[in-house]
């Protein structure tokens, strides 16, 4: 009968640095090998695709060279060294069993950095929403460079709010980082790598706060932050703001644990809970209520089981309310302006949705490429992690489990079940499901550690199963280094046509094409700021969105069926100040030969010039015209434009646009209209369609990130429609006097013109509601600091008592 292994010392005199250095070297060499080799392979594949050559293992092999061989050899040597150390003296398994604090932190750091090295592949990030966030990082940095926090961008959707209708925290951090490094793509990669690393550390710290062992916390942290379900949110879905949300979740629960289990309320943890609550709301408002629901369920069960103290409810509730008050700067302005943009009031409400078999299988079906679309975010969690989670649920409820472990399991299991059904289209629900699955994984390791018959290598076996499961999905070379032609085109447009707009059409390899109506941004907006009719965040687009998007779609349909723009479509685009339609395919700029009016222009290749584009449309009179109900909102998403025949709402908007043209009677050459259609003409306004004796002259027109400036000379009084959206959150000044603009029929600005020189400036304004929100947030922050200071002073000489479990 084999003898049980002799007990190992629980605390060695010093960390086993040779083993740690060997593991760190193995991680570094393997990461370098994958970065170098996959970068070369992707570049080779892109070159073959561009030239029409076959892509196969044999055709890709020549991409590898001497450096790849040396790195692979070094990796093999270090791997053998680690295996030898384990075989000769059980070095790795002993490390995991005794769980020396220094060894665990170093090992965790090495593994987290390795699991996040896919963020560091050279090239630009293209997947899904990546471009939208990179473009916003760039725009934020431009504002910071000019000395202000930008609230508005004129480069997207004819002009739209930049921060108010999305979580501003990530964009402020990303903008500052972009300003520091000078490159928005590099800033995103740095942010993703650092926050991914911190997420694993904070998750580990939270599990330790629960009283779970270091080995259990290590395996669970690696399993969650290395899972494809986690990484695909960022590498394949480009959901970079949710990096911060995922990072803050364990911090929120960690602070709650301390508040609810200590007899004395610590000022630091009270402040940490308040700040984390505020940060969750400010980063992405819809995720904060979901975090609160899960915390309430987890905490409610912990209270009923006696693991949490009822007396802790008051400090946690006050900290949470204080955090919500601090976040008013990201709440009240949204409530005020929701009717001015495409955001829907119920977009953040919690819903229940029963999971289908297909979605459940996706959690355990191996994948290393994008496997979900739209508002579905479930992806492969890892078969090893899920198996351990099932074992963890069973062992935590078995008769051999300690009371402490059982209480954690009973609090976690309902959260896992809730994670299967709680849903909202704008909430990335996989982060909550993965968070609690990781807790069950930790409980599984606790169960293995409690079984001394399993031997000292059982934790190593579990860790290796998890690592082997996540390793193949952690190496995801999604960055591309063959898109410089797009960056060149973007810089060209910024320098050549800074005050004009463009439309982008994507050409597929099979010759099909689709116009970009958003929400998205491409490499042309990564390093430059050309003006676009589409944009990067459609919920923040103004009420002109559906009309401009349908105008783009009409242009696409014209080009598909006739190869050229119709006169009416060209007129619609011209009054939006669209001067160019540019085309891109996977390898080049340039429109196809079927676009009959396209001609070459430098780095843009063949492009279409839209005749008579202008930011102004003049008239002597106004006429009432309002769209039927249901055309302004809700927002049209890009798939609806591809329906054949036209989707009913798109067709209704197209009919209204034609009615708008007929009513206005636009002369695109003179930039005049018989009458400007507005939704509510002022009382006494003339409807006489008299023409100008002399058409007003646009003497100056400049557009920057958050400011539009025009100078119009008029010999007769009249009106001007600007190719900028009506938005009450902006301020319009004419010759220094604040002027209330009229809302045009398609929600463009309409202003009066006086005889003489009209100097017009459009800039964001600070509304009374925003000032109130800032005052509440500032007061709450000051109050939170004062309360935390008082609590710290009060507790300085009083020892704290932990209710149960190891909080070290």
Listing of model-derived features with the role each one plays in the protein:
Residues 2-493, 497, 562-565, 578-583, ...:
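Membrane-embedded transmembrane-helix bundle of lipid-linked glycan/lipid transferases
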Residues 4, 526-578:
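Luminal/periplasmic acceptor-recognition loop/helix of membrane-associated glycosyltransferases
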Residues 82, 501-503, 572-577, 582-808:
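Flexible, solvent-exposed extracytoplasmic
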Residues 114-117, 141, 461-539, 640-645, ...:
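Extracytoplasmic
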Residues 169, 385, 506-508, 585, ...:
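Short, flexible loop/turn elements at secondary-structure junctions
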Residues 285, 332, 338, 508-511, ...:
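Short loop/turn segments at secondary-structure transitions that flank enzyme active sites
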Residues 295-297, 337-349, 480, 515-529, ...:
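Short secondary-structure boundary/capping segments
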